[in-house]
UniProtKB/Swiss-Prot annotation:
Protein encoded by which gene: gatB
Reaction(s) catalysed by this chain's protein: L-glutamyl-tRNA(Gln) + L-glutamine + ATP + H2O = L-glutaminyl-tRNA(Gln) + L-glutamate + ADP + phosphate + H(+); L-aspartyl-tRNA(Asn) + L-glutamine + ATP + H2O = L-asparaginyl-tRNA(Asn) + L-glutamate + ADP + phosphate + 2 H(+)
Organism: Borreliella burgdorferi (strain ATCC 35210 / DSM 4680 / CIP 102532 / B31) (Borrelia burgdorferi)
Descriptive protein name: Aspartyl/glutamyl-tRNA(Asn/Gln) amidotransferase subunit B
SMART domains: GatB_Yqey
InterPro entries in the cross-refs: Asn/Gln-tRNA_amidoTrfase_suB/E, Asn/Gln-tRNA_Trfase_suB/E_cat, Asn/Gln_amidotransferase, Asn/Gln_tRNA_amidoTrase-B-like, GatB, GatB_Yqey_C_2, Gln-tRNA_amidoTrfase_suB_CS, Gln_synth/guanido_kin_cat_dom
Quaternary structure annotation from Swiss-Prot or TrEMBL: Heterotrimer of A, B and C subunits.
EC number from the UniProt entry: 6.3.5.-
Length: 485
């Protein structure tokens, strides 16, 4: 018996537009409950929606970035269902004619790049948010501030075959939306939400069977998504062994994931398309988008995306996979590196400093590179001092620390503290000879093969120079001098 895990993702991205999808209310997170609502948000009689053009523009950008075909006619539909946080009794969405279809993304896997197809991207409005009191089973509240917020829903094909691949796809998609400034994609505040559809293809006695699809909800982190998939894979294997349930006999159902117990719990049978009673939104006309408009949006706003940036960085600067993945995870960090490397003679060393020292500071302080107090050129200058042998790597960390404290360049710190290394071979030779004259016993120990004698003499050399001598040159000259004694 063989099992193949099959996963499809439904991702809701709340766009960072100034106003909501179909009205002029502010589109912001949080705030006083029900303070950003209007008759359109609340579905009051007589209210008429109007399309936020930036919603369409955002969908065009997302479609182009995911290699999707963009439709020239936009049609909105009503999706009917009842829930307390949906005041109209329907959601304005898109059913049979989504704005984008047939896209794809490449993800990195241990066996190399893998193409994950995207079935569709469509526009819709968000619902309100239900709040249930922990100390009461009888009281719930609804905040409609989120009602009508602009969403894009991205539906992947069932091309994903592991929890790691699902996380890789979501990470790649999130990077794209952040690069394009379409959304913060913050799972904690709900601007990036994902439902996971999981089932198995079971091959038994030469016959393939599909297990019932479980749509898993309540997933608030990539860690939860991976854990839910791995649990569901095992659960469905056991269910098949015990009950032989198939997709044809049982259909699709919804399950919730409990972070604390790490298990999925059945919630309800999944609605079908007919249950939603879709029909065209009568209050919104068809909107025609010609190719020139689509091209104009692409040309105005589209930038180099992470996947392409990684390829370029590896070829241009010879950086490792780890380096380019980390640098491109944040477009502002990538920009910082690109500015720092412009006048650098050693791009790899610049990358190392940014990925170690700079990122360490950012993480410790909980700030972004936009809030960092050192200009990219300051890192370039510091690295050039190291490359030129004017300061040691150890000294560079001391310099960097003072640069951080004062917000000044490396040259200022080095000049004021007279920290520049002595690299003059004649000067170094004189100090080496002095140390040899003062330590004849160490010379004898060295000739007997005692390695610690070299370390002792190097220590004396550094002491005489107050730590300012170039240690690499000093070591070379010391060994050369010892060979002549």
């Amino acid at each position: 018996m063989e099992y193949k895990l099959v996963i499809g993702l439904e991702i809701h991205v709340q766009l960072g537009l100034k106003t909501k999808a179909f009205c002029g209310c502010k589109n912001e997170f949080g705030g006083v409950p029900n303070s950003r609502v209007c008759p359109i948000c609340l579905g009051l009689p007589g209210s008429l929606p109007s399309v936020n053009v930036e919603l369409i523009n955002s969908a065009i950008l997302a479609g182009h970035a995911t290699n999707s075909k963009i439709r020239n006619v936009v049609k909105f539909d009503r999706k009917h269902y009842y829930y307390p946080d949906l005041p109209k009794g329907y959601q304005i969405s898109q059913n049979d004619k989504p704005i984008c279809e047939g896209g794809s993304l490449l993800i990195e896997t241990p066996s190399g790049p893998k193409k994950i197809n995207i079935i569709r991207i469509h526009m819709e409005e968000d619902s309100g948010k239900s709040l249930h009191l922990l100390d009461s089973e009888n009281q719930s509240y609804v905040d409609f501030n989120r009602s009508g917020a602009p969403l894009l829903e991205i539906v992947s094909a069932p091309d994903i075959n592991s929890g790691d691949e699902a996380v890789a796809f979501l990470s790649s998609l999130r990077e794209i939306f952040r690069y394009l400034d379409l959304s913060e994609c913050n799972m904690e505040n709900g601007s990036f939400r994902c439902d996971v559809n999981v089932n198995l293809i079971v091959k038994e006695n030469g016959v393939e069977h599909k297990t019932p699809i479980a749509e898993i909800k309540n997933l608030n982190s990539f860690k939860s998504i991976k854990a839910a998939i791995e649990y569901e894979e095992l659960r469905q294997q056991q269910e098949w062994i015990q009950f032989k349930k198939t997709l044809n006999s049982c259909g699709k159902h919804t399950r919730g994931f409990d972070d604390r117990s790490g298990v999925t719990v059945i919630q309800r049978n999944k609605e079908t398309v007919s249950d939603y009673r879709y029909f065209q939104e009568p209050d919104l006309p068809l909107i025609e988008i010609d190719d020139s408009y689509i091209d104009n949006i692409k040309n105005l706003k589209l930038i180099e995306l992470p996947f392409h940036a990684r390829i370029r960085l590896k070829g241009q600067y010879g950086l490792s996979d780890f380096d380019v993945i980390t640098l491109t995870a944040d477009k502002h960090l990538l920009k910082y590196f690109e500015e720092a490397v412009i006048n650098s003679s050693d791009p790899k060393k610049v990358a190392n400093w940014i990925l170690s020292e700079v990122l360490s500071v950012l993480n410790d302080k909980g700030i972004s590179v936009l809030e960092f107090n050192l200009l990219p050129s300051y890192i370039t200058e510091l690295v050039e001092f190291i490359v030129a042998g004017k300061i040691s790597g150890k000294m560079a960390k001391r310099v960097f620390s003072e640069m951080m404290t004062r917000g000044v360049s490396a040259s200022v710190v080095i000049s004021e503290n007279q920290l520049e290394q002595v690299s003059d071979k004649f000067v170094i030779k004189q100090i080496v000879l002095e140390v040899l004259d003062e330590n004849p016993k160490s010379i004898e120990l060295y000739k007997k093969g005692k390695d610690h004698a070299i370390k002792f003499m190097m220590g004396q050399i550094m002491k005489k120079s107050s730590g300012k001598i170039n240690p690499i040159l000093a070591n070379e000259i010391l060994l050369e001098s010892l060979s002549n004694v």
